[in-house]
């Protein structure tokens, strides 16, 4: 059977990547995501930028490990924090996050509750530094800011949700910005559903 060349990742010497057509994990692509995060020094950058007020006297999972787990879940397509309970014993997730057991859904929910508005700005700054590193690697010299609004449906009684006449449904109406040349995600700002498309665009366009 033909096999592709094996590659060993740098963040964990016990993991190698190959494809022989045998059994595969549906989330094995996260190994490559983790390798990229390791090359960019994500964990160290997160420690520098993110400072979450935490009054827990005892905990198993620190805030940055929960953040990385949540990011991995979102990248893998698990948008609901409740998926954490199904993934706690997933071998790929445990390997890339270097944890014997992952944080539960309740731990993720409490983590999200701890995030402040200042933490949101810190996450934006972290995102921008990662983009800057990518731009240096690609030797990018031009930037086109593709700025637009979008709609996010809400269900139940969510804070600041409102009716949007254009989409004819309840939800949020956030602003988002991408690099029109590379597709890099530059920035996002959550707004209530009834906000006009261009409201706040001037201040939003000041990137980090």
Regions of interest found by a model, annotated:
Residues 1-170, 174-208:
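Dynamic "connector" segments at or just before major functional cores
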């Amino acid at each position: 059977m033909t096999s592709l060349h094996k590659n060993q990742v740098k963040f964990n010497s016990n993991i190698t990547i190959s494809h022989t057509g045998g059994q595969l994990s549906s989330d094995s692509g996260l190994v490559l995501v983790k390798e990229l995060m390791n090359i960019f020094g994500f964990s160290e950058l997160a420690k520098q930028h993110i400072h979450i007020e935490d009054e827990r006297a005892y905990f198993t999972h620190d805030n940055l490990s929960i953040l990385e787990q949540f990011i991995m879940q979102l990248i893998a397509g698990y948008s609901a924090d409740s998926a954490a309970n199904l993934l706690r014993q997933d071998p790929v997730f445990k390997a890339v996050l270097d944890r014997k057991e992952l944080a539960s859904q309740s731990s993720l929910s409490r983590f999200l509750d701890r995030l402040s508005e200042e933490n949101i700005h810190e996450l934006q700054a972290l995102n921008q530094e990662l983009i800057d590193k990518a731009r240096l690697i690609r030797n990018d010299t031009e930037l086109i800011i593709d700025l637009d609004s979008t709609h996010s449906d809400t269900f139940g009684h969510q804070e600041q949700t409102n009716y949007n006449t254009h989409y004819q449904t309840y939800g949020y109406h956030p602003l988002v910005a991408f690099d029109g040349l590379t597709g890099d995600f530059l920035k996002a700002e959550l707004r209530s559903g009834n906000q006009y498309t261009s409201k706040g665009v001037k201040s939003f366009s000041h990137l980090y």
